Amino acid sequence: MAARFPILCILESRPEDAIMSSGLLRRLHEEIPQASFTLVGSDASAPLFRDMPNLDDLLVIEGDGRGERFKLWNRVRAQKWGLVVDLRGTDLSGWLSRRKRAVRQPWPKDQPVPHKVIQAARVMQLEDDPPAPWLYTSPETDAEVDEFLAEYAKPGDGPILAIGPGSNWIGKVWQEERFAKVAGTLLGPDGPMSDGRLLIVGEEADREAAHAIRMTVARERVIEAQGRLDRLQTCAMLKRCRMYVGNDSIWTHLATAAGIPVLGVFGPSDETLEGPWGPNGRAVRGPKSMDDFRRHDPRLDQTINHMYDVPVDKVVDAALALHADTEA
């Protein structure tokens, strides 16, 4: 029997970034079956990894300051680690007893900056075969989601279209009426998911903004998950869906980590860095470039909606193409 191989992984604080690097943990688990994991994240990123197989401990450290690193060192210094993976790029691994380490380094200034999945893969020299984002969900989490979904069960239930209309900034929010048109096309009588259901994901605060979307189909075809499922439960729910359409948001990253076809609607954010990953991940944007947005909103933080010029027809066509291309 192979000896236990303890791995310490310091995850990114930003949950979206932690999701984009999550495939590294899956690769480690699959290639080192005897590995056990201690994961370090922030309040926002750590809960996404609570169902990681062979998880010894899940620690929360908010900042990257020396004081925070000392607190973390004091909690993990007694262990001799087989591998330390530091996705925040700190100097902590130099203070620990370990056989190997992989530490994020600044991307070379003379090289074009690639997608964040590739950036994360480079930490472990996997940039030629970057592992796709993936979040593990346990049988317990799956059972919780099944219980939630049972509230909406009815005979002849069809495939589920997930819509994520929220985002963490109004500048990235495509209008709900436009999402409603996308959902109506896919789920309507002549659509490819005419027998399907509509799942709306997001925070409780997003519920009001989704009114037009939920009115797209009959009430009994709508599954309301906003504010009812936490983020990892939402990922488990998304694993049960046929496809997803949403803004650049945590929900779009969760859909990518669920392994389903994903269409992201982008405006003042860069899909070449953070767009849905993989052959079944696609992005649509309007005519403006990132430089165009920054001329009007230099720090990309003003209370301005930048998404009005993303045309409905372009998103509808992309959604129909994604559905057709991923049809079994």
Predicted regions and their residues:
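Catalytic machinery of carbohydrate-active enzymes
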Residues: 1-328
